[in-house]
């Protein structure tokens, strides 16, 4: 399993253990990736398609659609509370802190993971993806991280997510270090 956030028995410690095991078992090249405003940029139309594939009851799908479009109360830097419809207006983003947000964020990240596997990149690059919420690393066989970075960018673009290039990098362990 690649996703370690929000699932039963999953947590940050298990993600770190998996990363260490992959490093130890021949995956020393790492793509340490950061997505720009992941929760705030998940496109509603594509997310609803993912939900629809897994939902038999159309009423549930309708409720999730309505929830994505409702206004959200936010606190500004001065501590004032305001209501915003930015997600509805932009047709993207899920509010953090809502009970259903973790499920939806994992579901959308799954699109990337399935795309990676469908292209056979897990086998071709000898790679293993480990995610925790919006944190993402791809552990590869030596010499494969640059290609993994290329494909990660390509797949993220195809699912309408933006890679934060300032925070995304290739790291070769043990020479380099990364935080997960």
Question: Where on the chain are the PLM-derived regions?
Answer:
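Active-site and adjacent loop segments of nucleotide-processing enzymes
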Residues: 180
């Amino acid at each position: 399993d690649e996703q370690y956030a929000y699932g039963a028995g999953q947590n940050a410690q298990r993600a770190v253990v998996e990363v260490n095991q992959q490093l130890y078992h021949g995956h020393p090249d790492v793509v340490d990736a950061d997505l720009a405003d992941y929760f705030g940029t998940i496109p509603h139309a594509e997310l609803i398609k993912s939900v629809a594939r897994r939902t038999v009851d159309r009423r549930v799908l309708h409720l999730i659609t309505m929830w994505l479009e409702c206004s959200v109360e936010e606190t500004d830097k001065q501590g004032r509370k305001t209501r915003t419809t930015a997600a509805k207006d932009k047709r993207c983003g899920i509010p953090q802190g809502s009970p259903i947000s973790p499920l939806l964020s994992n579901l959308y990240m799954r699109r990337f993971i399935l795309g990676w596997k469908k292209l056979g990149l897990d086998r071709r690059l000898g790679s293993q993806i480990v995610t925790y919420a919006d944190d993402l690393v791809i552990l590869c066989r030596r010499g494969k991280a640059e290609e993994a970075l290329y494909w990660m960018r390509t797949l993220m673009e195809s699912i309408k997510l933006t890679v934060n290039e300032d925070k995304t990098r290739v790291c070769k362990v043990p020479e380099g270090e990364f935080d997960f």
